[in-house]
């Protein structure tokens, strides 16, 4: 059993990184791997199936409703952004963009927050360097903020489900760290980003989403979260054998691999209800912070980079230094607070 689970874990971690077809169809791949892990781990039964069917419901509804609202309100939103851009200085606009998207992402979902970010960047028409910086800071903020509620992103949905906790558990556990990080990223965006008016900006591939695309994304999110629920249950024997006794500080740095792998997938493989709150906190903060370093680490990164045509190298130039600095700062916080 353990050997089979190790093979499945290796496939889950490596194939999305090396096989483009798997990366493009990550939700379906993880759905299949979730079934494989549950069968290999000997945990597939009616209660687990019921849980796997129920867990994705809230985030799926949130994604669908938010997608419809975004489609209907996109044009007015563009006009509002243009008016705000004319009325306030750019540093203040940059800070507000990063902070508000980060805080709202836990309600409107990380996916919709990323789509709004694409609209904002498209309207502002800054130089390429400044736009890339704004996107990276914003995606760090969105990735962190969305984890505060179980409807914000798949990682938080899965964490609440596996731990059997209430809606506001993550807000209590990592809320102070996440909210302070979101505000700090906003302040840094205001200070660091210096737009050059004459330079060439990003070429956006932004187009209005169709109802079919909204429905398709909704189905994929449902399958994604269902697969992660099965995956997390299937990996319980591995967690019990190898991770439960590890120091939370070691787990924190191990989770830097979230920079190249989807953090919800890693959360499914690592989190256990048998862990202490301090260990869960270290795991989540490590995953959330490092998830912003590179494009594959988080859903908002993938959406923004794809629609705005930001290359992996451009993202890494800004994302890696920001992420490493944030990891160091919050390691000290975890160590001494």
Give short role names for the model-derived ranges:
Residues 4-92, 199-219, 240-242:
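Hydrophobic transmembrane alpha-helices of multi-pass solute/ion transporters
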Residues 43-54, 156-170, 236-245:
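Membrane-interface helix termini and inter-helical loops of multi-pass transporters
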Residues 90, 122-132, 160-169, 248, ...:
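Juxtamembrane helix-boundary/capping and inter-helix hinge elements in multi-pass membrane proteins
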Residues 94-144, 269-282:
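Hydrophobic transmembrane alpha-helices that form the pore/transport pathway of multi-pass ion
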Residues 109-114, 132-163, 186, 190, ...:
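Alpha-helical transmembrane segments and, especially, the helix-loop junctions at the ends
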Residues 170-188, 277-337:
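C-terminal transmembrane helix pair
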Residues 203-285:
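Transmembrane helical segments that form the transport core of multi-pass membrane transport proteins
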């Amino acid at each position: 059993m353990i050997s089979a689970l190790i093979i499945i874990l290796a496939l889950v971690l490596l194939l999305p990184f090396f096989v483009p077809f798997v990366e493009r169809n990550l939700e379906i791949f993880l759905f299949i791997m979730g079934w494989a892990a549950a069968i290999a781990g000997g945990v597939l039964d009616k209660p687990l199936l019921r849980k796997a069917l129920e867990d994705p419901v809230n985030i799926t509804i949130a994604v669908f409703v938010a997608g419809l609202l975004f489609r209907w309100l996109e044009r007015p939103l563009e006009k509002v952004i243009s008016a705000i851009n004319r009325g306030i200085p750019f540093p203040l606009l940059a800070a507000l963009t990063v902070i508000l998207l980060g805080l709202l992402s836990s309600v409107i979902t990380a996916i919709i927050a990323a789509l709004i970010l694409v609209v904002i960047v498209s309207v502002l028409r800054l130089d390429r360097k400044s736009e890339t910086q704004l996107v990276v800071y914003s995606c760090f903020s969105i990735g962190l903020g969305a984890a505060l509620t179980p409807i914000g992103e798949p990682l938080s949905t899965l964490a609440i489900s596996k731990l059997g906790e209430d809606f506001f558990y993550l807000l209590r556990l990592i809320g102070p760290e996440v909210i302070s990080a979101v505000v700090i990223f906003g302040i840094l965006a205001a200070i660091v980003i210096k737009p050059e008016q004459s330079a060439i900006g990003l070429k956006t591939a932004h187009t209005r989403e169709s109802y079919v695309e909204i429905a398709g994304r909704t189905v994929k999110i449902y399958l994604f979260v269902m697969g992660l629920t099965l995956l997390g249950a299937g990996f319980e024997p591995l967690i019990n054998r190898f991770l439960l006794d590890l120091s939370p500080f070691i787990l924190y740095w191990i989770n830097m691999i979230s920079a190249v792998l989807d953090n919800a997938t890693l959360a499914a493989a690592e989190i256990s209800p048998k862990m202490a709150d301090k260990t869960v906190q270290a795991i989540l903060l490590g995953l959330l912070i490092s998830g912003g370093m590179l494009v594959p680490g988080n859903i908002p990164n993938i959406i923004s980079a794809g629609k705005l045509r930001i290359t992996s190298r451009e993202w890494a130039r800004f994302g890696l230094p920001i992420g490493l600095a944030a990891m160091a700062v919050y390691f000290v916080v975890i160590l001494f607070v």
